[in-house]
């Protein structure tokens, strides 16, 4: 049987967990096997910037960072379950990637 590998990524942790919960509910309703969600390493993007606009004075820095959270879910590729997965309302800032594997 084929498996569907679902990869979720985004900057808002709560929204990713909300989408994972919806996928779990679909798997329970349709009776397919589910593995995950497996948390993948969080990527931290750090941008240091100078506080003073002209370069004069002491060198003080602001450190801005953005964290990208990722989750991985494996689910059996049942036609009914995949149809329901396609109908999930995913927030704009959450990336979802579905790959079918044999």
Swiss-Prot record:
<dbReference type="InterPro" id="IPR027486">
    <property type="entry name" value="Ribosomal_uS10_dom"/>
</dbReference>
<dbReference type="Pfam" id="PF00338">
    <property type="entry name" value="Ribosomal_S10"/>
</dbReference>
<dbReference type="GO" id="GO:0006412">
    <property type="term" value="P:translation"/>
</dbReference>
<protein>
    <recommendedName>
        <fullName>Small ribosomal subunit protein uS10</fullName>
    </recommendedName>
</protein>
<dbReference type="InterPro" id="IPR001848">
    <property type="entry name" value="Ribosomal_uS10"/>
</dbReference>
<dbReference type="GO" id="GO:0003735">
    <property type="term" value="F:structural constituent of ribosome"/>
</dbReference>
<dbReference type="GO" id="GO:0015935">
    <property type="term" value="C:small ribosomal subunit"/>
</dbReference>
<comment type="similarity">
    <text>Belongs to the universal ribosomal protein uS10 family.</text>
</comment>
<dbReference type="InterPro" id="IPR018268">
    <property type="entry name" value="Ribosomal_uS10_CS"/>
</dbReference>
<comment type="subunit">
    <text>Part of the 30S ribosomal subunit.</text>
</comment>
<dbReference type="InterPro" id="IPR005729">
    <property type="entry name" value="Ribosomal_uS10_euk/arc"/>
</dbReference>
<comment type="function">
    <text>Involved in the binding of tRNA to the ribosomes.</text>
</comment>
<keyword id="KW-0687">Ribonucleoprotein</keyword>
<dbReference type="GO" id="GO:0000049">
    <property type="term" value="F:tRNA binding"/>
</dbReference>
<keyword id="KW-0689">Ribosomal protein</keyword>
<dbReference type="InterPro" id="IPR036838">
    <property type="entry name" value="Ribosomal_uS10_dom_sf"/>
</dbReference>
